[in-house]
């Protein structure tokens, strides 16, 4: 049985992003984001209700301050009382899991989207995704970038402006570009 491009995307396999089903999901997410981002002056409770319309899982008390940007939304799970400040971007072609009580600063970017090394595959529009997992009670400073396939352990701290290219152990403090364990 042949799998759809969306099924391949969700399985972390190479897929064609120009597929009509995938494009329809992008358009639906874009329409939702337009509505969500127009709620800038609303309460955290109102934002929470909006998030439950689109995101895969939304824990009690979770907040994402608009403006916010994502590819699809349905691949994002945000835990109880997790907080994302404004101008965050999540490219969620694969699962993004954000643990309970995690605090994410403004303009943080989380990427699951990846591209093949082969230029012919890239030119053909093929891409893939690798999931990002962020543990419980993590603090990610403003402007940090989390690359595809990274896991950040519970209670870790990512310094502002850091580029996280590899896994971060639980309780570690990382900073820099690329992010390295410090102190």
Model-derived segments and their meaning:
Residues 6-7, 54, 124, 131, ...:
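Short secondary-structure boundary/capping segments
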Residues 1-61, 179:
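Terminal amphipathic alpha-helical/low-complexity segments used for targeting or macromolecular assembly
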Residues 68-78, 83-151, 172, 177-183:
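Flexible, glycine/small-residue-enriched loop-and-beta-strand segment within the central core
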């Amino acid at each position: 049985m042949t799998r759809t491009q969306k099924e391949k995307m969700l399985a972390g396999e190479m897929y064609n992003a120009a597929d009509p089903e995938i494009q329809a999901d992008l358009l639906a997410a874009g329409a939702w984001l337009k509505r969500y981002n127009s709620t800038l002056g609303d309460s955290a409770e109102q934002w929470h209700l909006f998030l439950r319309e689109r995101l895969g899982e939304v824990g009690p008390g979770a907040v994402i301050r608009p403006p916010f940007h994502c590819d699809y939304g349905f691949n994002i799970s945000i835990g109880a009382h997790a907080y994302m400040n404004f101008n965050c971007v999540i490219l969620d072609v694969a699962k993004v899991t954000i643990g309970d009580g995690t605090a994410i600063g403004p303009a943080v970017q989380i990427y699951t989207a990846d591209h093949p090394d082969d230029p012919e595959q890239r030119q053909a529009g093929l891409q893939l995704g690798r999931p990002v997992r962020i543990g419980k009670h993590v603090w990610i400073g403003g402007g940090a970038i989390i690359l595809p396939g990274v896991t950040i352990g519970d209670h870790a701290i990512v310094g502002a402006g850091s580029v996280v290219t590899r896994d971060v152990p639980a309780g570690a403090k990382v900073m820099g570009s690329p992010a390295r364990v410090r102190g």
